[in-house]
Curated annotation (Swiss-Prot):
This is Serine/threonine-protein kinase RIO3. The modification Phosphoserine is found at residues 8, 112, 125, 127-128. The keyword ATP-binding applies. It comes from Bos taurus. One of its GO terms (molecular function) is protein serine/threonine kinase activity. Keywords: Antiviral defense, ATP-binding, Cytoplasm, Immunity, Innate immunity, Kinase, Magnesium, Metal-binding, Nucleotide-binding, Phosphoprotein, Ribosome biogenesis, Serine/threonine-protein kinase, Transferase. The lineage of its organism: Eukaryota, Metazoa, Chordata, Craniata, Vertebrata. The modification Phosphotyrosine is found at residue 122. Residues 124-134 have a biased composition (Acidic residues). ATP binds at residues 257-265, 290. Residues 122-159 are annotated as: Disordered. Involved in regulation of type I interferon (IFN)-dependent immune response which plays a critical role in the innate immune response against DNA and RNA viruses. May act as an adapter protein essential for the recruitment of TBK1 to IRF3. Phosphorylates IFIH1 within the C-terminal region interfering with IFIH1 filament assembly on long dsRNA and resulting in attenuated IFIH1-signaling. Can inhibit CASP10 isoform 7-mediated activation of the NF-kappaB signaling pathway. May play a role in the biogenesis of the 40S ribosomal subunit. It is found in: Cytoplasm.
Length: 519
């Protein structure tokens, strides 16, 4: 095979500086290439492509009914969809404005549907001019007009058209505009479209009434916060009970077990009281929490039980009525301590925290012991309960120097075959100005209950009074009997006023549990 050679270019005319000199350097000789080598390389490349095609066959995708294309531009469709969505949102906002206008009507207080709008206000700036902008408040009829200022000279106009700052029309309109400054809850009416003018006398009376109503509502709100509901507690009491549980003194409070006129009783499981010493005070497994109600409705007519008690007479004050509730709780604590020392079956006091008294629970497994009014006893058990009650009354009068003052079948419990006395917050000493009257009332309640229960040995109210008090008052009827009791009370009161009597030192003698006051 012939070799193909590339001919070198023919030399040009000789340069002026020499026939054999080239200003672009000496040209290199080209390498000769055989035609057979070029054809061999091309054949090898074709064979390699055939082998690759056989090893990796081309995958064909079947054409579907959908439209396909390689160079389809979708940017214009996206813009068109956004424009259509914008128009839909504007139509929705226009409908929302109409609904808002219909919903508010002519009301002075308007409800805004702004949170339900689709289009942002700046996106809706190219709306038509004839469409009313819902946020335009330049001509808002609900906004009071700005009053015309009065110059320093005190009048406006000249000649007959002079208007001073004391003009009746100007002052009336200013007073009408000032009604907007009243409290939100005060109804001032709707004066849109009306030229209302209030005189100074009417405006001042209305202003004073608005302030009075605001103060009255504040007092009612404060009273509601400090009051105690029928079966609930106020926030302060709830916080005190929470602190008892949080400190570990009580494990948990299960619920309400009794509700009275002066207090609410809750059941709780006891824990332990840490007093900073090596040994901690043991609290009963089950406790009763007596919460004295902080409302004074039931205590207003019962102050005679505590204001004439010599133990609390010096501390009683009508100027601090809320502290009377604490004195009731403290009084019951000291009375229970006296009874406990005398061996009378009664709850054991654990702790006194302001108006909350924690005691031992009389019952079992959250079930309180039944009252004598509720329990069904046999004739022998009823007779035994009567003699126990008689002994408890004598023991309470002689050893504890107390009169229950509210003893009845509702304040006596039957538990483990014994009569238990509860609710002694109103108990007083026999030297109380009405102590003997309270004792006679207790004797009447006890005598009537056991006589109705079929106890033949039950004494009458007058015989029971003499048996408990040790007095031998002889009278044919009840009126004379009460007259002699009042005479004895009067004699005792005169003796006290003449000779004086010191308050009982119960703080040293009773040895009760700690009294906690958190001011």
């Amino acid at each position: 095979m012939d070799l193909v050679r590339v001919a070198s270019p023919e030399p040009g005319p000789a340069a002026a500086w020499g026939p054999n000199k080239c200003p672009w350097a000496t040209p290199q000789n080209t390498i000769s290439c055989s035609l057979s080598d070029v054809m061999s390389e091309q054949l090898a490349k074709e064979l390699q492509l055939e082998e690759e095609a056989a090893a990796f066959p081309e995958v064909t995708v079947a054409e579907g009914p959908f439209i396909t294309g390689e160079n389809i531009d979708t940017s214009s469709d996206l813009m068109l969809a956004q424009m259509l969505q914008m128009e839909f949102d504007r139509e929705y906002d226009a409908q929302l404005r109409r609904e808002e206008k219909k919903f508010n009507g002519d009301s002075k207080v308007c409800i805004s549907f702004e949170n339900y709008r689709k289009v942002h206000p700046y996106e809706d700036s190219d709306s038509s001019e004839d469409e009313v902008d819902w946020q335009d408040t330049r001509d808002d009829p609900y906004r009071p007009a700005k009053p015309i200022p009065t110059p320093k000279k005190g009048f406006i106009g000249k000649g007959k058209d002079i208007t001073t700052k004391h003009d009746e029309v100007v002052c009336g309109r200013k007073n009408t505009a000032r009604m907007e400054n009243f409290a939100p809850g005060f109804q001032v009416g709707d004066g849109i479209g009306m030229d209302l003018k209030l005189s100074n006398h009417v405006f001042n009376a209305l202003k004073q009434h608005a302030y009075s109503e605001e103060r009255r509502s504040a007092r009612l709100h404060e009273k509601k916060e400090h009051s105690t509901a029928e079966k609930a507690v106020d926030p302060k009491t709830r916080l005190l009970m929470y602190k008892m549980v949080n400190s570990g003194m009580l494990e948990t409070i299960t619920g309400c077990i009794s509700t009275g006129k002066e207090s609410v009783v809750f059941h709780a499981y006891g824990g332990s009281m840490e007093d900073g010493k090596e040994d901690s005070k043991v609290i009963p497994t089950e406790c009763a929490i007596k919460v004295f109600k902080t409302t004074l409705n039931e205590f207003k007519n019962r102050d005679k039980y505590i204001k004439d008690d010599f133990r609390f007479k010096d501390r009683f004050s009508k100027l601090n009525p809320r502290k009377i509730i604490r004195m009731w709780a403290e009084k019951e604590m000291h009375n229970l301590t006296r009874m406990q020392r005398a061996g009378i079956p009664c709850p054991t006091v654990v702790l006194l925290k302001k108006h909350i008294l924690v005691m031992s629970f009389i019952g079992h497994d959250q079930v309180p012991a039944p009252k004598l009014k509720e329990v069904k006893l046999s004739s022998e058990e009823m007779k035994d309960a009567y003699y126990q009650t008689l002994h408890l009354m004598q023991q309470l009068y002689d050893e504890c120097t107390l009169v229950h003052a509210d003893l009845s079948e509702y304040n006596m419990l039957w538990h483990a075959g014994k009569v238990w006395l509860i609710d002694v917050s109103q108990s007083v000493e026999p030297t109380h100005p009405h102590g003997l009257e309270f004792l006679f009332r207790d004797c009447r309640n006890v005598s009537q209950f056991f006589q109705k229960g079929g106890v033949k040995e039950a004494l009458g109210e007058r015989e029971l009074f003499n048996a408990v008090s040790g007095l031998n008052i002889s009278a044919d009827n009840e009126a004379d009997f009460l007259a002699e009791i009042e005479a004895l009370e009067k004699m005792n009161e005169d003796h006290v006023q003449k000779n004086g009597r010191k308050a009982a030192s119960f703080l040293k003698d009773d040895g009760g549990p700690p009294i906690l006051y958190d001011e």
